[in-house]
UniProtKB/Swiss-Prot annotation:
Protein name: Gametogenetin-binding protein 2-like
Acidic residues bias (residue ranges): 396-420
Transmembrane segments: none
Residue ranges, compositional bias (Basic and acidic residues): 385-395
Gene Ontology CC: cytoplasm; nucleus
Signal peptide feature range: none
InterPro entries (alphabetical): GGNBP2
Skewed-composition ranges (Polar residues): 476-486, 546-557
Region (Disordered): 372-489, 532-562
Skewed-composition ranges (Basic residues): 373-384, 455-472
């Protein structure tokens, strides 16, 4: 806040008081104070420009001659008012700036130095600022930003500023802000402000008594307290409180009183006592009383506080308004002068600032576009390098996997060759056919596949690997079959070796005349044979409980097993039954020949009866018979389960859906 440095009356000539950046301020009816803006400064004050800003303004400064510069930096009142109406939205600020403009034009005060308002109603710049480009450029530097920052304190959704809004004093009471204006005043201003004329105090007291309708007795006490204050009556009255008037000094010859300025607490108490009266907070409580002289003294102090409140508030509002008006006038004036200067520069250089700005923006955009393209190319190059690196890694992975697959296949072939050599050695052994059973060689366990990174060519590699493995196993099977054939042929050609097939067929042909291997009885009288031929449903004979053949219970299942094993005596013996009997006897010989020989015999049997794979009719009929029995038993079990469930529900008191439906049906029938 600006300082109040001097106080004088309105009748005095202020030409000798008002200096640079000083402005007279109305403080009362006949009281004037001098506002000093040197301590606060104006918004147009800024540090000297240097560097690029100075070079740019120097170029514009040199384009114009001295006469053109003078002409460009001088505007009339009409141009100023037009710019003012465009920039300032608050009506109160505009009216105050207009009054200040005309006031400074008439008086010629240098309040806005280096701006000057001439008697011709024109706004210009002092001669010193026009000589150097640095001084002039500093004054015109960032004028638009300065104006926007100054006018940016208006309320939201309102055109008035905070100072000229109706809510300016409602938000914060003056009793909390009066210290600001009190601290901005010098001692001479404070002393002059605290002088109260007795006539003024008496008028305020009369209005106060009429407002609150004091009774005659109370009015008398208040008037006596007033006369004691101004010194008309002696203070030796009954009930007088001297401490209430302790900080008020009376001047009887001059007919005024002085409020002590060094007692801030006393002033604060006076203002807080008077604030409800000034704001109208006690308007509903109009009737007041002063029963004692002490209460009457307090009522007189309330009137003194009302006078001080009005004076301080008037100075506070005037000081803030004049200070803001000076700031706005200076900012708008610099803005208007700068616009006029730029117009002359554009006319001289033949191109407007807007076009220059467009060219500068275009250059910046082109630079950004080039930078984006370079960044895009760099990113694309980096992406291509990454892609090539991935391709190389994939190729290396494929090569490694192919090498691993080849090595794995090579190992499998070596294992197969070793197994074939072992089988060849076993078959070439002369005692290999003397009832010794050759166990099947264990198939080589497949080695776990080597894990590799998932690539797009993995399905192709897997299919290729499967084909190679399949070809290898096919080749191995063909080699084994060829080796087995080559080994069986010497056995058939050699008459000294035992032919297993001929032995089996000769033993089948002599089954009637031979003896039973179990009980050593003749075959027609063999009880084992009779048990086998028995296809009834009797129990197992106890006399042959230890027999292996009669250990199976004579039942339909046992009969079917015996029939499937070729042990049944059918009337018609076809080739199929002979073959089944052949293989059943072959299984009873405890496998006294090699696996390769059994495989060759099965291949010959499969070649002869290639089209005999079908389900016999007896098996189909037995399945149907069992199916009907199973279905019937299932229905019986379901009915039994349902009956048990309903019985349990009845026992536990639970009503089932069937019982509900039965009750509903019975109810409908009853109706």
């Amino acid at each position: 806040m600006a300082r109040l440095t001097k106080v004088y009356n309105t009748d005095d000539d202020d030409s000798g008081y008002v200096g640079r950046r000083n402005l007279p301020l109305v403080a009362g009816d006949k009281l004037m104070m001098l506002m000093d803006l040197n301590s606060k400064g104006l918004v147009i004050d800024s540090p000297l420009i240097r560097g690029r800003e100075l070079e740019e303004f120097s170029r514009k400064f040199k384009l114009l001659t001295e006469a053109e510069r003078r002409q460009s930096l001088e505007i009339d009142s009409a141009s100023f008012m037009e710019v003012l109406n465009q920039c300032v939205q608050c009506v109160g600020c505009r009216r105050r700036v207009e009054r200040l403009f005309h006031q400074l034009t008439e008086t010629g005060h240098r309040t806005l130095d280096p701006l000057e308002l001439r008697p011709t109603a024109t706004l210009g710049i002092v001669e010193e600022k026009l000589k150097t480009p640095q001084a002039l450029g500093t004054l015109l530097y960032r004028h638009h930003e300065v104006l926007n920052n100054l006018l940016d304190n208006k309320l939201r959704n309102k055109t008035r500023c905070v100072l000229h809004s109706l809510d300016a004093f409602r938000a914060k009471p003056f009793s909390e802000t009066w210290r600001e204006v009190w601290s901005a005043m010098k001692s001479n201003c404070r002393n002059e402000l605290t002088i109260i004329e007795t006539k003024e105090l008496h008028d305020v007291l009369e209005n106060y008594l009429k407002k609150h309708k004091f009774c005659s007795g109370c009015r008398t006490k208040i008037e006596r307290a007033y006369k004691i204050l101004i010194g008309e009556i002696s203070s030796k009255e009954k009930g007088y409180a001297a401490q209430l008037y302790a900080h008020i000094r009376k001047c009887v010859p001059d007919q005024h009183i002085h409020v002590t300025t060094n007692k801030i607490e006393f002033l604060d108490a006076l203002i807080k006592r008077a604030e409800p009266e000034v704001n109208g907070s006690y308007s509903k409580l109009r009737e007041r009383h002063a029963k004692t002289l002490e209460i009457a003294q307090e009522e007189v102090l309330t009137c003194v506080g009302m006078i001080m409140y009005e004076r301080l508030r008037r100075i506070y509002v005037s000081l803030r308004e004049e200070e803001r008006a000076c700031q706005v006038l200076a900012a708008v004036g610099v803005h208007a002068l700068c616009r006029s200067f730029d117009t002359f520069v554009e006319q001289k250089q033949g191109i407007s600032n807007l076009e220059l700005l467009y060219q500068e923006i275009s250059r910046a955009e082109r630079a950004k576009q080039i930078k984006r393209e370079q960044k895009k190319l760099k990113k694309k190059k980096k992406k291509d390098e990454k892609k090539n690196l991935l391709h190389r890694q994939c190729d290396d992975t494929e090569a490694n996997e192919s090498d691993e697959e080849e090595e794995e296949l090579r190992n499998e072939e070596l294992d197969l060759e070793e197994e074939s050599q072992m089988q060849h050695e076993e078959l070439s052994d002369p005692g290999a056919d003397d009832g010794i059973v050759i166990e099947a060689a264990r198939s080589p366990e497949p080695e776990p596949e080597l894990t590799s990174k998932p690539t797009k060519s993995k399905p192709k590699k897997q299919s290729k690997k499967k084909k190679q493995k399949k070809a290898a196993f096919t080749k191995m099977g063909n080699q084994k079959q060829m080796q087995a054939t080559a080994r069986v042929q010497p056995l058939d050609a050699d008459h000294d070796q035992l032919d297993v097939a001929s032995c089996i067929s000769s033993s089948i042909a002599k089954t009637v005349g031979d003896k039973c291997e179990e009980c050593l009885a003749s075959m027609p009288n063999c009880p084992c044979e009779q048990d086998v031929r028995d296809s009834g449903y009797g129990s197992d004979p106890p006399s042959h409980a230890g027999s292996r053949t009669s250990s199976a219970i004579s039942s339909p299942e046992g009969s079917e097993v015996s029939c499937s094993d070729g042990l049944c005596n059918h009337d018609v013996h076809d080739e199929d039954s002979d073959d089944l009997l052949f293989y059943s006897h072959q299984s009873q010989l405890d496998h006294k020949f090699s696996l390769l020989q059994m495989w060759d015999d099965f291949d010959e049997y499969d070649d002869k009866d290639e089209e005999t794979y079908y389900i016999p009719q007896e098996v189909v009929m037995a399945f149907k018979c069992h199916r009907e029995q199973v279905q019937r038993k299932r229905e019986e079990l379901r009915a039994k389960l349902r009956a048990n469930f309903e019985r349990l529900c009845v026992q536990h008191g639970v009503q089932t859906q069937v019982q509900k439906s039965k009750r509903t049906t019975s109810a409908l029938v009853g109706q």
